Structure formats: structure tokens, C-alpha cells
Amino acid sequence: MKEKIKLSLLILTSIILAVANSQTQPKTLAMTATVYDQHTFYNDNFENQGPAYLTKNMVVSKLDKTLKIPQLVSLDINVEGKTGVNYFGTMYNPKLFKYFFSENTNASPDDKNSGKNFPLLMDLILTLNETSGAYEFSKQEYFPINGKGFNDPSYKVPPKYKADSPNVDWFKMAGGGYSQNNYNYCIKLNSKFTYFNKGEVFNFRGDDDVWVFIDNRLVVDLGGLHTAETANIKLKDITNPPLQTNKIYDLDFFYCERRATGSSIQLSTTLEIFCVDDYCGVCNGDGTSCCTSSTCEDNNACTIDKCPKLGSVAPGKFTKDDCVYSEVVCPIESNQCLRPYCDPKEGCKTSPVECVNGNIDKCFEQFGSCDSSLGCQYNYKCNAYGKCNLGCSGGQCKVKTSEQCSEEFGNDPCYTYSCDVELGCVRTEKCSQEDAKLCTINTCLKNVTREDDRCELVSIQEECNCCAGHTVDPCQLPGCGEPGECKPVDKIIDDNNLCTIDKCENGTITHTPVKCGGCSICDSKTGQCVINPPICDDDNVCTIDTCSLVENPNGSIDGVCSNKIFDCASNDTDLCNIWTCDANNGGCQSIKKVCDDPSPCLVSKCEPSTGQCVDSPRTCDHGGAFCLISECDERLGCIVYNRQCASDNRKCQAGVCVNGTSSEEGHCTSVDYDPLPFGCNTAAVVSTAVIAGVTVAAVVGLGIFLYGGKKGYDYYQDNKSKGMTGANSNPLYKESGNAGQNPLYNDNNL
């Protein structure tokens, strides 16, 4: 920004050196105001045949800094009782007053009292009175928008109006049809001035509503429908608090014609009024006179259509190509069974999530309906293999083999191995005692090479003889103790598997598996139930799948699956991130918390440590140039404009701002007008060196005006075709001793 301003200063200085020799007194002061065309059909406060009185105290005495339009003191109306300011001010429909000075083009064109209006731009040009030194505007028959807006013959007359008023010509105005003139309109001008405390005045005479605010304080209060009334304001008389010398203030002018019985206006001021034109070219405008919500409409519900920010387009240069479009981001659905999407015709919508049978690797199968919290529900395809499951790939389940189970048990060749879906790996003796004959033991030979030779029957005839005539428990084998003594021994029932309960009953040896319920499985190395997490996998990226061991009242152990929704923000210290988990779109997703600025002059940002929006004053930069002043306007945001300088003799000299250099600080100086106005003595001739040190009024970037030499200023104005003429050098209004009226001022023109 600073570099752009420096470059502009260099360019303007070269212009000044080429064309400037002296200052000339501006003959006009031109500003672009907004005219809001009105019609009694849309707003019956116009052409209303109520009383015609000058009515004070209709509007609030303090102008809202953000709205910058007058507001009624009351919305009450008592027509029958004929009381109250709104009655005497013929404000019979107070709720529509807000559309006197604000755009309402989107209101219904077919309905009565919809408040619809038609904003138009108008150049308000004040002419220098070289005798008084004031800038004046005077029209006895003032119709600035004849043939325009609602008065344009091409405007489509609402059918309801034709039905209600079949004999009244829309274009001749409904209140009387006295002429083709457009009597129903309101003018708004928001501007600024620097108060120099040198006798500045603001004088007005006209009919119907006139309200003028200085420093957002009501100083001219001529409300209601009335004949021409006068208000003369000496700024030095403004108190509570008084205006401060060399301070910049707002000047806001509001004027309405509401009845077809005359239209006159006369304005005279010595204020050095200036503007920061918006991209519509309107003095201190907010852009709404040429860009509204409908201007940038692209008929795509999936885009956010906005007018450009103030200052992003050169003054008066707005086109629809400057509109700003951004993509609508549809909010993430908390319902996992709905998927958000944007329809170009209808905007954000949702569609049901289609739960496909089988996920990407085909290892899961859908069951049941979609769960609003968890989304699509899937069963692990390989759950049927229970504790023999080793996972899934490409839809193929991997199952424990006998070889793998053999490894778990140490590859003992005396057993046959397999995997049981409930028990996991199990083994069976190859040399079963049930195959043994009487008085023999079936033993296993580990070192043989042929499986057919693995089992060998060993005779225990001697032991049988010792127990002859004795009853031996079926779970025991005969044995000998002392000579001739029968001493049975227990059968070997241990299968060396810690995950089985070995038992012999009535001679039958059993190996009952240790029961581990749910998602638990017995660890063959420890004999304890341990978790088996794969069983709990629900194929949902938004859940944490865990298996926990729970002891039942009977002492048994069960594994319980848990599919807790994942907290995406658990490891994020930035609380400005808004997290959600979309099971149908990759899992955790975050968006930054958006803090809306509460006003144009406050910037709101999210504080990462708290997640709260924190407001701070907006900083407005003017590049450090002495001849530029920046401020934040509650309605417009950051604006940058030229510094106004008071001259030593306002009638004979112009106040000129000189930017600082490396060796000299910026300052204001006085330069004689050339030619000098009548009555001014010849003074020092301004040098090229002085001119080269200043800046002229010009638009830079965000509607910036740079001040300086008058010739350079005139050169810029000639090329711009339209401008704020004389903003830097209006001569002082010369007061008389009788109530502030200039003796040479022609009062007959009022």
C-alpha cells in the first residue's frame, strides 16, 4: 500500500511540474448524491393529502454512525385524533420512512406500500459566488429526475395500480396529476469537511423535509410538508460540545419532495466539503447506489454473490465484472446417514447415504439400516472363522492352518493340530489310549520318520497281573507296588494345551477348551483369555474399535467390543478448528471458526487458546504521507482522503498541503490565487519548487485523494471529467453584522 502511494506521489509530482505555475480559484464544487425516486403506490407518505406544516422533532437528533440515515422518533400515528409529530408531518405510514434514504429495489413491484424505491445518481454542483465567497445552489423549479426511475415512460405500471386508480396517470404522479414533473423523490448526501473556525456557515431554504446533521448532530430540522423554509447555521454556534479547529467532521444532508405543490431548493455554504467517492462515484457512498444484492445475482444457488468491498474498485468504475463470487460450503451433517451437497437451483440439500454391500476391500458386509450416529453398519466378513481368523484381503479370509497351530504348540509330532472357530488352535493325541488293547499302553515315538510307525503298543502284562482280581478305576492303569501289591497309576490326560481343561471320567479322557467369550481368545502360551481386536472392527473410520475383558459374576471372562466415536479434536490445541467426522468421506475433517466482524471498524479473530472470537479495532493505513488522513468510518470501514489546509486569507489564497521529505516535515502553506480575486493585493508568486512538493487530488487505489498544486489538480479533473471541484480552496463566506447574511447576498433568489 505504501509503495503504491509513493508511486502515485511521483506520478502526480511530474504532472504538477509539467503544467502547474499557480493556483486558480475553483468556480464550482461538485459532488455526486443519491436520489431515491419514490411513488405514492409504493409509499403513501408521498402525495398524501394530509396536513401541510413545518414539523420539527420528527427525527432522532443523533444520526446513527452505521446506518447514516435519519430515524423517526416514533412509529406511532394518530390520524383520527390529529395529534403527534407524524400526523403533522404527514408521515401516515411511519414504517416506510426507512426507505426514504435507503435502497429497497428488491421490494415487490406489484404490491402497494411495499416500500420499493429507485436509486439514481445525481451530480450536485454548487457555483462560487465571487462576491460572498460562498458556494451556492439555487433552483426554484427543481426536478432532477424527470423522465427517470418510476417516471420513465418505459416503466411497467403495476396492474394493481391500474385497477385501483384507473383514471390517474402513473407518470403524472398519483397525488394530483398537475404536470409531467417528478415531484416525489429524496436526496441523500454523506460528506465531510474540515472545520477551520473561520466563520463557516451552512444556509438552506426549501420546501418539504430537510434534515442536516453535522458531527452526527441534527443542526437543520425542517420536517414535514411545507412551503419554503429557511435555516442558517453558523458552525461556531454549535455547542455541547463545540466543534474543534482543524478537525474533520461528517456533514450529512437529507432532502425530500413529497407533494406536487412546488419544488424549490437553495443551498449556500462556505464549508470546504469533500468526499471519498465509492465505486459508484457517490460522495461518501457505501456502494449500494450501483450494486445491491440483485446486481451480482448469477442465478447459481451454489455461489455466494457479493458486491466488491469498498475501495477495491476505482471510484465510479464499477461493473458487474467486479462482483465477487465464492463457493457455498454446505455444512457437514451431524446425521451420518445424510450426505450434503449443493444444487445450483436450490442450494444446500442432503441425500441419503447409499450403504454399499462390501467396502473397498470387500471384507465387510452391511447389516441393518444406516445409523444416524455411526453411519452405515458393517459386519466383518471373516467373523464366521472366529478365533481362527487371521484377517481379510480383497474379500478373501485368511484362516489359521494346521501348520500354524502346530507352531503354536511347539510342533510336537505326537499330536494332530487343527483350528476351532470357538477355541482357536487345538490338538489331538495321535496315539490314543482308546486304541490300546488290554494290558497295553499306546505310546508315541517322536523320532520315527514314518507316521505309520509313530504309535507303539507297549505291554504292561506284569502290571495287569499285579491287579488281577482287583477293580481298577477306568481313569487309571494297572500298576505294581510291593511284590504282589496292586497299585494303579493315573492315566496321562494332559494334552500340554493350557487352553484346555483335561479330564478323565469313566475312562473317557476329554480336553474341554477354556471358554473365552465375546472378542476374547485363549492364549495357548498362558492359558489366559486375551483380547482379539480384529473381531470388533466395524469398518467405520469414525469409531475407535476396542476389545475389553470383563469378568462375569460366575468368574468367567468375556471380551466386550466397544465402538466409541472418535474425538477428532482430542489432539488439537487450536480450539478455532471445528472438527467433525464423516464416515462416508474419509473420517476427520476440520474447518476454521469464522468470526464475523461486528462492525466495519472492528476486526474479529478467533483466539486459538479459547476458541472465542476476540474483537480489536481495525487499523487503517495511509502510507505515512502527511497529506493523507486515514480513519475508520462506522459505515464504510477504512477510508483514506486528502488533508485539507486552511489558508491565511481564504478569499485570496488556497491552503496547500506539502508532503514531508527526508529533510523537511510535511506542512500546510498558503498560495495566492492567480488571477487574484477582486480586492486581493498581489502577494508572493508561488514557485515551481513549492508546487513540486505537494500532491493534487487524485484517486489512488481505494478512492484515495492526494492533495497539491492547483494546475495539476485541474489537469486531473479535466481528464476525470467529473470530480470534487474546489475541495481544497473554497473561500471564506464573508459575514455581515446582521445575523450572518452577506449584504450583497440576493435574498430575492430564495
Curated annotation (Swiss-Prot):
Residues in the Cytoplasmic compartment per record: 710-750
Assigned keywords, A-Z: Glycoprotein, Membrane, Signal, Transmembrane, Transmembrane helix
Claim: Endoplasmic reticulum is one of the keywords in the record: no
Residues bearing glycans: 129, 447, 506, 554, 571, 659
Ranges where the PA14 domain occurs: 140-286
Subcellular location: Membrane
PROSITE patterns named among the record's database cross-references: PA14
Signal sequence, renumbered to the chain: 1-22
Pfam families registered for this protein in UniProt: PA14
Compositional bias of kind Polar residues: 738-750
GO cellular component, as recorded: extracellular region; membrane
Family in the record: Belongs to the prespore-cell-inducing factor family.
The name this protein goes by in its record: Protein psiO
UniProt organism field: Dictyostelium discoideum
